[in-house]
Design a protein with these regions (language model features):
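Long, positively charged binding patches that form subdomain-scale interaction surfaces
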Residues: 40-126
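Long, hydrophobic, amphipathic alpha-helical segments used as structural scaffolds
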Residues: 8-11, 15, 31-35, 78, ...
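Internal, Lys/Arg-enriched amphipathic helical interaction segments that engage polyanionic partners
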Residues: 1-65
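Acidic-enriched, low-complexity/disordered segments with a strong bias for Aspartate over Glutamate
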Residues: 6, 15, 36, 52, ...
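Long, charged low-complexity segments
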Residues: 108-176
Length: 176
């Protein structure tokens, strides 16, 4: 189906992905096609958050690359890589925030501090996203450590991060 979804624009099958998604929904399949990838996300709001973020990201290569890679890693049924999907999701936010602050070397924490002032986001919201970044970045976290006692990253973790990071990108875009 992924192949056909990707091919549908080339051979001009109108609304192929939409039709398949309608059938998947009707049959309660538990899957949706997003960006020609079959993923275990079915909530219309969650799908919309990801699709909207991908639309925003299409203007920024780095953000688009991270979001697409996160989706790719999440949707790989033979060898899913949830850990790296989480990394790519938070990296998309970091890339978008560095674009918003016009500081390509800014860490997410530094960029959020500036965005808190310029985009008037609430300090608790800034803190919560900083904490999510910390979850992915601390010594036992997802981005830096591959020790035996590591956190086991699950499908639910990767879905949460992709959806949350997509929603946060959408939120920041709306605040511009």
């Amino acid at each position: 189906m992924e192949f056909l979804s990707d091919l549908s624009t080339t051979i001009n099958i109108p609304d192929f992905t939409k039709r398949v998604n309608n059938n998947l929904k009707r049959e309660l399949a538990g899957y949706t096609i997003i960006q020609d990838k079959i993923v275990q996300i079915t909530s219309e709001q969650e799908v919309k958050a990801i699709e909207d973020a991908l639309q925003i990201a299409s203007k920024y290569k780095s953000v688009e690359t991270h979001l697409n890679q996160s989706l790719e890693l999440l949707s790989n049924r033979e060898n899913p890589d949830y850990r790296n999907s989480v990394k790519e999701s938070i990296s998309a936010v970091e890339a978008y925030c560095s674009i918003l602050t016009n500081d390509s070397k800014a860490t997410l924490g530094k960029a959020l501090t500036q965005i808190e002032k310029t985009h008037k986001i609430h300090s608790a919201l800034k803190s919560s996203f900083s904490a999510l970044y910390g979850y992915t970045s601390d010594s036992g976290g997802i981005r830096h450590s591959l020790l035996e006692d590591d956190i086991k990253v699950t499908l639910e973790d990767a879905k949460f991060m992709l959806i949350s990071c997509s929603a946060f990108i959408n939120y920041l875009k709306a605040k511009e």
